[in-house]
Amino acid sequence: MVVWVGTSFKMNKTLEEALAFARRLADADLERDPRVQRFVIPSFTAVREVKRVLTESSVKVGAQNMHWEDAGAWTGEISPLMLKDCRLDLVELGHSERREHFGETDETVGLKAAAAIRHGLTPLICIGETLQERNEGRADAVLRRQVEAALRGVDTEAGEAPILLAYEPVWAIGVNGIPATADYASERHRGIAEVAKSILGRPVPVLYGGSVNPGNCEELIGQPDIDGLFIGRSAWSVEGYLDILARVSAAIDRSSPRQTASERKLP
């Protein structure tokens, strides 16, 4: 299987900074590992130009959010048609910062995921429990609810359309985040994959995000239930991103042939 490894810039990088990153990444394309699918998610002001720079490369480019409607009186929003007009490949949905600060709900994430699939965009759906939910022993129930809500609206129309899930425990995100242990993350991934496959009837890759760094990326990707990495600040310099990509390739070399958790756990 292909391992997905990418980064979102969040609200960082000017257009020129994003383009410098993209150009360096394009230059490194000949050295890419075909077992690893790379992706970058810049700010809205940079997506079109970053995609233009990376068009001839294997790197996929996405947006950090979108509305579920194609058009209308939604001031300040971006529609899936607009993202397709920028020739984007994927769209990040439901990040915990969107849920906490901008009123994103399980319902709206589901609407957006369905809209993304209708328009040929790969949804990268973020899920994760808070520290309180983890401490109360509710992590698995919260993750099940989030996965079911995100996929309920796409189960009949998804077909074989690509869908990605990103497990990002809220307590592991940000400058003060505490990375989940590889064992803890792997156990959560196993449950997430099983729920997703029970809905869609097929495997869905589950990426880990939450303080991924050069010191833990190899152990994380070495877990059989972790299908990729969604990196934050450790990949905001292109050198940092390329370093983690090299470490991921080395970890894959040391591991046996990979299957997704859902492929192993369910018939």
UniProtKB/Swiss-Prot annotation:
UniProt subcellular location: Cytoplasm
EC number of this enzyme: 5.3.1.33
Bridged cysteine pairs (disulfide): none
UniProt cross-references to Gene3D superfamilies, sorted A to Z: Aldolase class I
Active site per the UniProt annotation: 95 (electrophile), 168 (proton acceptor)
Pfam families, sorted: TIM
GO terms of molecular function: triose-phosphate isomerase activity
Location (main, coarse): cytoplasm
Reactions accelerated catalytically: L-erythrulose 1-phosphate = D-erythrulose 4-phosphate
Coiled-coil stretches noted in the UniProt entry, renumbered to this chain: none
Residues where substrate binds: 174, 211
Extent of the signal sequence: none
TM ranges: none
Quaternary structure annotation from Swiss-Prot or TrEMBL: Homodimer.
Record NCBIfam families: PRK00042.2-1, tim
The protein's role, per its UniProt record: Catalyzes the isomerization of D-erythrulose-4P to L-erythrulose-1P.
Protein name, entry field: L-erythrulose-1-phosphate isomerase
Source organism per UniProt: Rhizobium etli (strain ATCC 51251 / DSM 11541 / JCM 21823 / NBRC 15573 / CFN 42)
Source lineage: Bacteria, Pseudomonadati, Pseudomonadota, Alphaproteobacteria, Hyphomicrobiales
Name of the gene encoding the protein in the UniProt record: eryH
